[in-house]
A protein has these predicted regions:
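A beta-strand signature from Gram-negative outer-membrane beta-barrel systems
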Residues: 1-13, 109-111, 124, 130
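Surface-exposed loop/interface segments of Gram-negative outer-membrane beta-barrel transport/assembly proteins
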Residues: 5-95, 132, 136-216
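Short, mixed-charge, low-aromatic patches
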Residues: 67-72, 105-112
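Outer-membrane beta-barrel domain signature
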Residues: 100-105, 139-141
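Generic recognition of flexible, low-complexity loop/linker segments
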Residues: 102, 112-115, 152
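Non-cytosolic beta-sheet module surface loops
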Residues: 106, 117-118, 130
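Residues that define the transmembrane beta-barrel architecture of outer-membrane proteins
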Residues: 108-112, 119, 144-148
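Outer-membrane beta-barrel channels and translocator barrels
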Residues: 109, 120-121, 157-161
Length: 216
């Protein structure tokens, strides 16, 4: 940014832009519960010699019967109850699209810049500021990154032989997001554990946080 000059008329300039970004890679993830669970079990068996899920053959048969249901069919509910491990528990048989439930493909960005410069006979000045905001990928409770820049540049001629100058800068940024975990695990754990066979909310309205249907 150019500095102000002595005996210069005040000049104010502003520029800003708005843009929207989206992923350039494919987000066409597996949303059929049968295949999602089967793949997880296959790789866990190959590496850990134990399945990832605790689905029975009957569960997999039910998942197979539902594999083409884009939405829940009342005749083939996505959550049923069964007595296991000595208690009644939910068994998840869904075809759930976790990516589009958790994440938003559209990420808007706002950027505002203002600059003021000028000067008098003995003083030149320049003041500039910037505000930047970008929405993150989270859909339900959007995460947000914001940054603030501020700069003041002054030069004063006190005497012909004495000039005082200052250049002050300020920067602050923050990233606000919701969730129990840090930002790393907020993305890592759904990637590892949110099988398409699971749903986010139980029939009784409680959130699905942990389930005995997996080994995690």
């Amino acid at each position: 940014t150019k500095s102000g000059k002595y005996n210069e008329k005040a000049e104010v300039s502003y520029n800003g832009y708005f843009s929207v970004s989206s992923p350039t890679t494919s987000t066409d993830y597996e949303t059929r519960g049968y295949y999602s669970a089967k793949i997880a079990d296959f790789f866990m068996m190959a590496t850990q010699n134990t399945p990832y899920t605790s689905y029975t053959e009957a569960d997999y048969k039910a998942l197979w019967e539902r594999r083409n249901d884009k939405t829940e069919n009342p005749a083939r509910p996505w959550v049923v109850t069964d007595r296991r491990n000595g208690r009644q528990q939910y068994v998840y048989l869904a075809n759930f699209d976790w990516y589009n439930y958790l994440y938003d493909d559209s990420r808007p960005t706002w950027d505002h810049n203002i600059n003021i410069k000028g000067g008098t006979k003995a003083l030149s000045y320049m003041v500039s500021g910037r505000y930047y905001q970008q929405k993150g990928v989270n859909r339900i409770e959007p995460d947000m990154f914001k940054s603030y820049n501020f700069r003041v540049k002054l030069q004063a001629e006190i005497k012909p032989w004495l000039t005082i100058a200052s250049n002050t800068k300020f920067f602050q940024s923050n990233y606000k997001y919701y969730g129990y975990e840090d930002e790393y695990n907020n993305f890592r754990k759904p990637t590892l554990h949110a099988l398409a066979s699971f749903v986010p909310v139980n029939p009784d309205g409680t959130a699905v946080s942990h389930t005995s249907m997996t080994q995690s």
